[in-house]
Amino acid sequence: MTHRFSRWPLVRRALSLAAASVALAACSDSTTEPPPPPQTSEITVDASAAPAYVKLGDPASTVTVTNPSTSAEWDLSFFATSVSVNGGAAGPGGVTAYCLCANANATVSELQAMTPANQLAAFDAVTSGSVPAASSFIADALNPAIHGWVTGTGSSAAAVPTKSWIVRRSAGSVILGKFRVTAVSGATATSAGNVTVEYSIQPSSGAAFGAVQTRTLNVAAGPVYLDLAAGPVSATSAWDLQLSGYDIKVNGGVSGTGGVSALLDDSTPFASITAAYASTAPSVAYRSDSFGGVFATSPWYRYNITGTDNQIWPNFNVYLVRRGDTVFKVQITGYYNTAGVPRQITIRSSRVS
């Protein structure tokens, strides 16, 4: 008897093995490489004449911003020693921050010994495990130069007429004025209602104050702009103070470009504040509006630590900056460039998660 064996099972097996080999090769070829680890960026920005804006990333970069209050293209802004995040009152970016603050209590000798090189290890040690819950991060809020002029809200709101402010215009010739709030009425949870103010201003630089003016301004319907020489004006005119809700803003700093600043005087009666008296206050004592957040409550530097150096000393604290689900770590490592020029801020940053 002759036996015949079919060759097809053998052929099918060979084809199956070949197909498996091709599939394995294809899988090997399509394997993706793991993403590169986050890189540490280091940039220096000129924060001397105007705010400098930084977009964090791999790497971080400086960006040009025309209107920071409407732009989401920046994460951090730097001006002199101030740092703002693009969130809350400062901008629409939803950026928040948190300070790890390991060096908050550093001694003078410890600060003097700190350098960008020897503080790199502390920066590198911050990982995703260092990141707290998102609720621990905070956005920026307005930090007005004129605050504390009212206590309470709604029916309990009351003016604080013992607090006066010397107001300084520095655009062009320096012009001084004085201002206080004497009464509020019709206040709600969100607005001081009718605000009665007293103020006076020099008609020209070096002159005595003019007559004291008294006005009651209704801020319930929206912002009221006040020129201390001309009275209430439109938003597009030159103005010194803006009253809105429970805020009084000066036309300077983050609130305007008018070069207006203010200095609290709660120890001198309003009637005793003359132009001659006001002129004795040094210009560095005045404040413009700023944004206050983590970088304000937990500063990145100490000043004049020896009592005679008059220098800015970075404390090399590491800050966490959150944009959506992405968190970056930031360390400010310098205020001066190699030539000793101030307001040249050096920032070290890297993505954490």
Tell me what each language-model feature is.
Residues 23-26:
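C-terminal motif of bacterial Sec signal peptides marking the signal peptidase cleavage site
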Residues 2-16:
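Bacterial N-terminal signal peptides that target proteins for export
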Residues 17-21:
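Sec-dependent N-terminal signal peptides
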Residues 31-353:
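Surface-exposed, beta-sheet-biased, low-hydrophobicity segments with strongly acidic/polar composition
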